[in-house]
């Protein structure tokens, strides 16, 4: 008997020592819910002496912002009841019969409930359900219950308060909030992908997941707003300047040029392509600028159903295919004229037909299937699908670059052979401008080609930064949070290469002797009104060194006759491929 008694005492002592009780805060109390957050109102909230509902809501709203960007399956009554009960726990009251004092105790959320919600909402990396309370070092989320010792208050030694497990409910509860810079947009979700009732992707809304209510802003937070404005403004400015320059050159070589040769036609058709590319770049002015064209709403990118977007995309694709084809034709013709000096090609009608057919074939189908859309992280309306980009642009561009590279190399080789054998340095100077034009355009096309492959090869790295972006927006105000993307300088260079062609051409041809000759002999400066103004200007002038105004007029007329008579015609200017 003595041995059994000793064993009983040992067991009792061990059990009572091992039993751990949650502490009771004598100043803790039950309060009515103040209702400042976006949760279902509660009748009674437990508040300890070291906290209040307002401070608890700061933490609560942090997780609401996190859940706002989560899937719809996470946004249900079960999830929100669990989250609310974690920071604003339900209050349980025990009355001390000897003093009639109310003892408040929190009803903690069950561990399995916490684990289920954090796993379903994919926030296990942000919230630890196994954490301990700071003072008692007991689980914040008990497995079954919280045990209290209420003997001091006239109660039981092992007062058991079951943990809280809200009723299971799959009813969706949309909180209408997303962490900045994400933008909330309500929608009815039936399933995934094409099962969504509003088919939002076709309207330009991009959600962070298939069943989320948070949309990515437009433009995407790859750069700061100031940097995006700079990109858009740069694109607008260069496009406008390029448009004016190319229109001037087209008028010069195609409209007022009285003696057009086939090289003038080649150059004019290339310039016409640049005009169309520039129009595509300036079409945003019709809707308030490039930003408004690409992003009609703060969370919507422009798509093919927007008339201005569809027009800009089609014109750009048609024009840039035209441009690279005429570039290839020019390089071939330049090589052929140098290689076979006395032989002439008369293929201009064939060239025009071939360029039109190819350009239409590579642009119209894309418009029919709605591929011309604005990108969230781009400054141009273009082909959206990488597959169609490769088929309808990068593939043809690769072929053209190969052809262009071959003929440019052959041109340089032929010039080298001629200069080396004949010592005609003036021949090299003669071909310098067309060669420079080919090289500049070639280099910009090469950059576009290489940049595309850089972007595609870096996509995994860009997408891999989404976790860092998510951590940033839930822990800060989101203003400085960025999704990793291409360097800012590379985007500016891409803008430059796409929009600069008109400036290239006018720098090489806009003020050449041939251009000046075309304008001086054109109807613009040779009509009755212009002649009267010239006569008036000359007759009103004073002479220097005894020369009369009549002498000046006669000298001018003689020079004019020499330019239009037996001298070289405007078609024999140094811009042509002619041996001297």
UniProtKB/Swiss-Prot annotation:
UniProt KW keywords: Glycoprotein, Membrane, Receptor, Signal, Transmembrane, Transmembrane helix
Domain FZ, residue spans: 25-154
CDD domains: CRD_FZ (cd07066)
Region called Disordered, residue ranges: 542-580
N-terminal signal peptide: 1-18
Short motif (Lys-Thr-X-X-X-Trp motif, mediates interaction with the PDZ domain of Dvl family members): ranges: 514-519
Highest rank taxon of the organism: Eukaryota
InterPro entries: GPCR_Fz/Smo-like
Residues the record marks as carrying a glycan: 52, 97, 149, 170, 186
Comment on protein domains: Lys-Thr-X-X-X-Trp motif interacts with the PDZ domain of Dvl (Disheveled) family members and is involved in the activation of the Wnt/beta-catenin signaling pathway.
Name of the protein this chain belongs to: Frizzled and smoothened-like protein K
Species this protein is from: Dictyostelium discoideum
């Amino acid at each position: 008997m003595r041995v059994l008694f000793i064993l009983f005492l040992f067991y009792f002592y061990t059990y009572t020592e091992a039993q751990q009780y949650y502490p009771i805060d004598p100043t803790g109390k039950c309060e009515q819910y103040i209702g400042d957050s976006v949760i279902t109102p509660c009748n009674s909230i437990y508040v300890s002496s070291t906290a209040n509902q307002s401070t608890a809501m700061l933490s609560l709203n942090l997780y609401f912002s996190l859940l706002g960007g989560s899937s719809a399956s996470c946004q249900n009554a079960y999830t929100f009841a669990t989250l609310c009960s974690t920071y604003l726990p339900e209050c349980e009251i025990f009355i001390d019969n000897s003093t009639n004092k109310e003892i408040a105790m929190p009803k903690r959320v069950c561990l399995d409930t916490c684990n289920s919600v954090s796993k379903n909402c994919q926030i296990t990396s942000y919230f630890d359900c196994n954490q301990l309370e700071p003072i008692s070092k007991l689980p914040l989320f008990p497995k079954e219950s919280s045990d209290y010792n209420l003997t001091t208050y006239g109660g039981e030694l092992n007062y058991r308060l079951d943990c809280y497990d809200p009723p299971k409910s799959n009813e969706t509860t949309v909180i209408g909030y997303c962490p900045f810079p994400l933008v909330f947009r309500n929608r009815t979700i039936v399933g995934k992908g094409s099962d969504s009732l509003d088919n939002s992707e076709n309207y330009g809304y991009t959600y962070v997941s298939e069943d989320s209510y948070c949309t990515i802003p437009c433009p995407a937070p790859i750069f700061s707003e100031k940097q995006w404005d700079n990109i858009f403004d740069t694109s607008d400015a260069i496009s406008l300047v390029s448009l004016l320059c190319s229109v001037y050159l087209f008028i010069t070589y195609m409209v007022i040029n009285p003696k057009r040769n086939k090289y003038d036609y080649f150059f004019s058709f290339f310039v016409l392509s640049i005009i169309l590319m520039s129009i595509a770049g300036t079409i945003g002015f019709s809707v308030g600028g490039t930003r408004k064209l690409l992003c009609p709403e703060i969370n919507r990118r422009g798509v093919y159903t927007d008339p201005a977007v569809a027009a800009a995309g089609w014109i750009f694709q048609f024009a840039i295919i035209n441009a690279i084809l005429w570039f290839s034709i020019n390089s071939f013709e330049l090589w052929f004229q140098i290689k076979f000096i006395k032989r002439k090609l008369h293929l201009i009608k064939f060239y025009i037909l071939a360029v039109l057919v190819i350009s239409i074939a590579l642009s119209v189908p894309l418009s029919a299937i709605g591929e011309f859309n604005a990108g969230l992280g781009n400054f141009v309306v273009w082909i959206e699908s990488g597959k169609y980009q490769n088929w309808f642009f990068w593939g043809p561009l690769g072929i053209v670059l190969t052809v262009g590279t071959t003929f440019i190399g052959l041109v340089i080789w032929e010039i080298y052979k001629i200069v080396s054998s004949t010592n005609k340095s003036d021949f090299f100077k003669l071909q310098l401008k067309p060669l420079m034009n080919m090289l500049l355009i070639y280099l910009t096309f090469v950059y576009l080609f290489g940049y595309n492959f850089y972007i595609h090869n870096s996509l995994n790295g860009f997408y891999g930064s989404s976790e860092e972006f998510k951590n940033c927006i839930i822990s800060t105000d989101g203003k400085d949070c960025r999704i990793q993307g291409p360097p800012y300088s590379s985007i500016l260079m891409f803008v430059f290469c796409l929009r600069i062609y008109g400036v290239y051409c006018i720098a090489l041809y806009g003020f050449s002797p041939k251009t000046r000759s075309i304008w001086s002999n054109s109807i613009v400066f040779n009509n009755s009104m212009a002649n009267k103004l010239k006569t008036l200007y000359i007759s009103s002038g004073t002479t220097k060194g005894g020369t009369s105004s009549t002498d000046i007029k006669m000298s001018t007329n003689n020079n004019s006759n020499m330019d239009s008579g037996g001298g070289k015609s405007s078609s024999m200017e140094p811009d042509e491929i002619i041996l001297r």
